[in-house]
Amino acid sequence: FPAGRLDKDTTGFVLITDDGEFAHRILSPKNHIDKTYVVSLRDNIEEEAVSLLENGITLRDGTAFLPSKIKILSDKECEITICEGKYHQIKRMFCAVGNEVTNLRRIKMGRLFLDERLRDGECREITADELKMISEKE
């Protein structure tokens, strides 16, 4: 079964496992496993938006998101690292700062990067060392 999920229009890293205990451990919010995404946006990324997202943001409906880490890649593209996994989290966060996500791809879980040799829909087994990397902090 999948350890975590992606929205229907998000691509990238999905971990499938038969180890329920491991899946629970990496999915549990108390363990704060980092997940990194490449985000393409409709509009340029504003400094104020980066600051708000990096400090944590609360939506009008009261939903609070923990601080995220953002690395600017270009005017309309960034990497964002979050440790939660709330419903449509990244899309909702960027909407709250006046922008819209046009493409979203998960590239990393914990310290393990998505294997760039894999095309969408392909999979491979991970090694024991890679498995450990998922639950390790940077």
Q: Where in this protein do the model-derived segments appear?
A:
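Basic, flexible Lys/Arg- and Gly-enriched helix-loop patches that mediate nucleic-acid binding at interfaces
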Residues: F1-E138
